[in-house]
Design a protein with these regions (language model features):
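NTP/phosphate- and nucleic-acid-binding module
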Residues: 1-311
Length: 311
């Protein structure tokens, strides 16, 4: 866990109620000794990378901060095209309360707070006893993997317990030292699991804005078309488009098959017509339809699709 690190940063100096909320975010490596039977590919591992964040806030800020986190999660899911997910309110196991920090009153208070927020936002959710963290209840976003596993992708956790144990304080309106509330959030959760789910969802056809190489260029004959291919490559790069130029001495059909298998969003084939007319002919990895455009038209098309995050 990297929670302690963020707490020590907060504790480094005394804060006023006017300073809150304070949000600290980081990309961190985490380690968890998962049972060998639970380890699965990069969906569930013993070492993983997480985009973690902690929000230190006043009690009256809990609802607005949690709503803000939920809105951010939904914005991110929209960009990635995720639609099949569920909200889960993760509660403590009332039959085994000894494994949780804190008293019944604080647990009921925090569970009811998250329940009320979910109801007020209008999102459908279900409740799951025994799925809470040891320090507090959570709103988890659950997704179903390709092999049927129900996994948590994003999480928002409400924590009254650890501020007490770490003796975190701020000065309230009455000039008294009081405890803040901590909201743990992970928008993408484990980056490893997120990437696994993204690849399953897209079948490897990453959206244009996210693809490592957005355009692959294939000159038909290096002797006649490579110079123009390099001009196209340079122009695309100047416009911030990630491009690969396949200038290997291989047959066009071979390079085309490799490009399709590599799932490049756009594949350009440049021959005599394109070189003479300063145009490009493209196809995608998912369609055999060929389209010819002027070079400027293609650049503007790609830039617009990247800007709008067209899938």
């Amino acid at each position: 866990m990297n929670c302690q690190h963020n707490r020590m940063m907060f504790k480094n100096r005394l804060h006023s109620y006017r300073d809150l909320p304070i949000r600290i975010a980081e990309i961190a490596n985490d380690f968890r000794y998962e049972a060998s039977g639970a380890v699965c590919g990069i969906e569930r591992t013993r070492a993983f990378t997480q985009n973690d964040s902690h929000i230190f806030c006043r009690p009256d800020q809990i609802e607005s901060e949690v709503k803000g986190v939920i809105d951010l999660i939904l914005d991110v899911y929209k960009d990635f095209g995720f639609k099949d997910f569920k909200f889960r309110l993760s509660l403590r196991d009332t039959k085994n309360v000894d494994k949780y920090f804190g008293n019944d009153e604080l647990w009921e208070k925090s569970e009811n707070a998250l329940r009320t927020i979910l109801k007020n936002t209008g999102h459908e959710y279900y409740e799951a006893e025994g799925e809470a963290a040891f320090y507090g209840p959570k709103i988890d976003v659950q997704v179903r993997s390709a092999i049927g596993h129900d996994e948590t992708l994003s999480t928002v956790q409400l924590d009254y317990q650890l501020p007490e144990r770490f003796e975190l304080e701020y000065i309230n309106e009455d000039n008294e030292k009081v405890r803040p509330v901590v909201i743990h959030r992970a928008i993408l959760g484990s980056l490893d699991r997120f990437i696994a789910f993204l690849l399953e969802e897209t079948k490897g056809y990453l959206p244009l804005w996210l693809a490592p190489h957005q355009v692959n260029i294939i000159p038909v004959n290096n002797n006649y078309h490579l110079e123009y291919a390099k001009e196209v490559e340079e122009l695309l790069k100047k416009n911030g488009i990630r491009v690969n130029l396949d200038d290997r001495e291989e047959k066009v059909g071979y390079k085309m098959r490799e490009a399709i298998m590599s799932k490049y969003p756009y594949i350009l084939v440049l021959g005599d017509n394109e070189t003479q007319n300063k145009t490009i002919t493209y196809r995608t990895s998912q369609s055999e339809e060929k389209v010819t455009l002027s070079l400027d038209e293609f650049v503007n098309k790609v830039k617009e699709e990247i800007e709008k995050k067209v899938r």
